[in-house]
């Protein structure tokens, strides 16, 4: 099964004049200079024929997070200047690169989490806006690396917490260094090795306990290498890209990830070939996902830690990335979630706190309001909403 494919890039049309800009709503990136188009080339053939065209709006995703975990937001990111620390706010800026007149779009993550009706928070998340220095990539090929991830634990908090604390560390250690012939192939191999190694580490630790841990976790990670997104996921947590279509003058929800559940044909066939079975839509009638980190008792039954990996070229029409676990999408469709966030970003009544830009305040409010609304709509699961702002 092909694990790596391109998400389609929309056809370019001239950016709208001032009149059209007004139809898109107020300017949300007033602290950012306008970006020029990225030179992305013609691209290769579409390898995933199940992906919707960029203009379609089918896709969604929910993110989850652990309250007990040591927060890693911004950990590993470049240190702020004394002035930024004083203001308590880090401006999102574009990283301009002197090659092919390209512009690296700035990325900044925001998150909100709610325990909901569950007894404990079993979700975890990681926001690393810039880990370029830690990855030490080939300077001539890569100028910016960012990492965002959500993990939805089940059977306990240990697998999701372990993945949140260790997956990006393993990724940094395995990230390509020195001479690289193909960045994309090398990054793909790096992600596959990282997931395999992290799962093996957790299973080794889990099996050494008495009694053995039975925790498991989904994983949805977005690795940004310059303006290319690499999305790796296990299970039913999802990543969604909000992209503006200039022809229709509407925003679309583009799915960046693929859900893994035992009822899907390929997943069920793999489980059955390994000696397992699917009952009531679950592995052995118990486990709801067919790929995960942990879940040692199900790994011999065909459950795997091999992620689906997809690639997406960022464009000037991209607004934000939504990462979330199924707690959100039990009560929100992807389109509803994207439109809810957009309405918050256009709300001029949102108060700007001291030390924060208007854009920061709106994105934080969007995360909090969406998480609250999911709980109000009756989501019985933990709810975590992560939104990654794309600077223009």
UniProtKB/Swiss-Prot annotation:
Tissue expression pattern: Widely expressed. Highest levels expressed in striated muscle. Much lower levels evident in various smooth muscle tissues.
Biased composition (Basic and acidic residues): 72-90
Reported cofactor(s): Mg(2+); Mn(2+)
Cofactor note: Binds 2 magnesium or manganese ions per subunit.
Residues with the Phosphoserine modification: 13
Pfam families: PP2C
Catalytic activity entry: O-phospho-L-seryl-[protein] + H2O = L-seryl-[protein] + phosphate; O-phospho-L-threonyl-[protein] + H2O = L-threonyl-[protein] + phosphate
List of residues that carry N6-acetyllysine: 210
Cellular localisation: Cytoplasm
Enzyme class: hydrolase
Any one Gene Ontology molecular-function term assigned to this protein's record: metal ion binding
GO cellular component, one term: cytoplasm
GO BP annotations, alphabetical order: signal transduction
Domain PPM-type phosphatase: 108-390
UniProt subunit comment: Interacts with ILK. Specific association with ILK is independent of the catalytic activity of either partner.
Protein name in UniProt: Integrin-linked kinase-associated serine/threonine phosphatase 2C
Source organism of this protein record: Homo sapiens (Human)
């Amino acid at each position: 099964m092909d694990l790596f494919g391109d998400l389609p890039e929309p056809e370019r049309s001239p950016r709208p004049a001032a009149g059209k800009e007004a139809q898109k709503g107020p300017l949300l990136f007033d602290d950012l200079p306008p970006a020029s188009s990225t030179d992305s080339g013609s691209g290769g053939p579409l390898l995933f024929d199940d992906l919707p065209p960029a203009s379609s709006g089918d896709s969604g995703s929910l993110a989850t997070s652990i309250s007990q975990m040591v927060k890693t937001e911004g950990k590993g990111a470049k240190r702020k200047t004394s002035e930024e620390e004083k203001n308590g706010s880090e401006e999102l800026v574009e990283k301009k690169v002197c090659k092919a007149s390209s512009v690296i779009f700035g990325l900044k993550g925001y998150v909100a989490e709610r325990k909901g009706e569950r007894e404990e928070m079993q979700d975890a998340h990681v926001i690393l806006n810039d880990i370029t220095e830690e990855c030490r990539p080939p300077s001539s090929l890569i100028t910016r690396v960012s990492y965002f991830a959500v993990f939805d634990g089940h059977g306990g908090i240990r697998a999701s917490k372990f993945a949140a604390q260790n997956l990006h560390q393993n990724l940094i250690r395995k990230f390509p260094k020195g001479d690289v012939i193909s960045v994309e192939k090398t990054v793909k191999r790096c992600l596959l090795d990282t997931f395999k190694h992290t799962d093996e580490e957790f299973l080794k630790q889990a099996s050494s306990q008495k009694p053995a841990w039975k925790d498991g976790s989904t994983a949805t990670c977005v690795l940004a290498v310059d303006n290319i997104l690499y999305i790796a996921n296990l299970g039913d947590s999802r990543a969604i890209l909000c992209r503006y279509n200039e022809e229709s003058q509407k925003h679309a929800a583009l799915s960046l990830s693929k859900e893994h559940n035992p009822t899907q044909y390929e997943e069920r066939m793999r489980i059955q070939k390994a000696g397992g079975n699917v009952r009531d839509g679950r592995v052995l009638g118990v486990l709801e996902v067919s790929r995960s980190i942990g879940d040692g008792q199900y790994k011999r039954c065909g459950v795997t830690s091999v992620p689906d990996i997809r690639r997406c070229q960022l464009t000037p029409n991209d607004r934000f990335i939504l990462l979330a676990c199924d707690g959100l999408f039990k009560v929100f469709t992807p389109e509803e979630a994207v439109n809810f966030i957009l309405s918050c970003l256009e709300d001029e009544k949102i108060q700007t706190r001291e030390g924060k830009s208007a854009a920061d305040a709106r994105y934080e409010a969007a995360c909090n309001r969406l998480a609250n609304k999911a709980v109000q709509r009756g989501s019985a699961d933990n709810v975590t909403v992560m939104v990654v702002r794309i600077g223009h």
